[in-house]
Design a protein with these regions (language model features):
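Hydrophobic alpha-helical transmembrane segments of multi-pass membrane transport proteins
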Residues: 13-20, 24, 53, 73-96, ...
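Juxtamembrane helix-start motifs in multi-pass secondary transporters
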Residues: 38, 185-189, 248
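Hydrophobic core positions of alpha-helical segments in small-molecule transporters
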Residues: 13, 41, 78, 105-106, ...
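Alpha-helical transmembrane segments of compact multi-pass small-molecule transporters, enriched
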Residues: 45-49, 105-119, 134-135, 195-199, ...
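Membrane-interface interhelical linkers
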Residues: 1-13, 47-78, 96, 119-131, ...
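Glycine-/small-residue-enriched transmembrane alpha-helix faces in small-molecule transporters
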Residues: 1-41, 151-178, 198
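Non-cytosolic membrane-interface motifs at loop->transmembrane helix junctions
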Residues: 37, 101-105, 159-160, 218
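Helix-coil boundary and interhelical linker segments in multi-pass alpha-helical membrane proteins
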Residues: 30, 95-98
């Protein structure tokens, strides 16, 4: 299988997994889970499981990455500006509006990534890239709203958090590209999530949160942590390293279909 084909498949699967994550997150928030607590839970548990996997399977590579100061500086930026802010902003956007509106706003992101890539490389976008961008954003809009504008009832807070989610989503895609090529997606995602989760813990209220658990809550937590976080983030960033940030951000627009 070619590199492009493999990256395309990984990114599409990640987008589908993210759709489940958004649905699970919306269910948990309507059943008493605050946004910060939910963000903290998924970062800590997913990060711990990924780091544990690396300890058991490739401890030497994990230790080498942790000792590399340049890598850890980039990883810290990725953890705070990409993982932490993006997960919080997306869930906050859902909370302030709805899953469809939040998804449409977040997928303004590919436009920004294309603009950044063209400016960085000093090249103009191709006709194919522009058409793909229009089709992806337009398709996301139609899927999320069924073509009915009245389903996009955006409050000022919902608009802010949705656009902020798009910005942080771009950072999440762009910052770790070189890290993943060097150290692998599992190491980068695992340590990044652990760092972000630890930083958030004193401020999220998770230590004071009163858990009300049921089988449905367990299933929703499994959906958002195992499928929507560990699987989705790892596959997406690996796919991005293979097909590039512009194509991966367009392919991930399959998310609303699964949601």
């Amino acid at each position: 299988m070619s590199k492009i084909a493999k990256g395309t498949i990984l990114t599409l699967v990640a987008g589908i997994a993210w759709g489940l994550s958004g649905t699970s997150g919306q269910y948990l928030m309507t059943h008493g889970f605050p946004v910060l607590v939910l963000t903290n839970i998924r970062l800590l548990i997913a990060g711990f499981l990924l780091v544990l996997y690396m300890v058991l399977t490739n401890r030497r590579k994990l230790v080498e990455m942790l000792k590399d100061q340049k890598a850890m500086m980039s990883l810290t930026l990725f953890a705070l500006l990409g993982l932490l802010l993006n997960q919080f902003a997306y869930l906050k956007s859902i909370y302030e509006s709805n899953a469809g509106t939040a998804t449409v706003l977040q997928y303004v992101c590919p436009v920004g990534i294309l603009a950044y890539t063209c400016l960085k490389d000093c090249v103009a976008p191709t006709v194919t890239e522009v058409l793909s961008m229009m089709l992806a954003v337009g398709g996301t809009f139609l899927i999320a709203t069924h073509g009915q504008l009245n389903q996009l009832s955006v409050t000022p807070a919902g608009l802010f958090w949705g656009l902020f989610a798009a910005f942080t989503y771009a950072l999440y895609i762009l910052i770790p590209i070189q890290l993943i090529k060097t150290w692998g997606s599992i190491s980068v995602i695992g340590v990044g999530m652990m760092l972000a989760g630890i930083v958030l813990t004193p401020f999220s209220g998770i230590l004071r949160f009163h858990w009300q658990l049921s089988m449905k809550v367990y299933l929703a937590l499994a959906g958002i942590i195992l499928v929507g976080t560990i699987l989705a983030y790892t596959l997406f960033l690996k796919g991005t390293s293979l097909v590039g940030p512009v194509k991966s951000s367009l392919l991930a627009a399959v998310e609303p279909i699964s949601a």
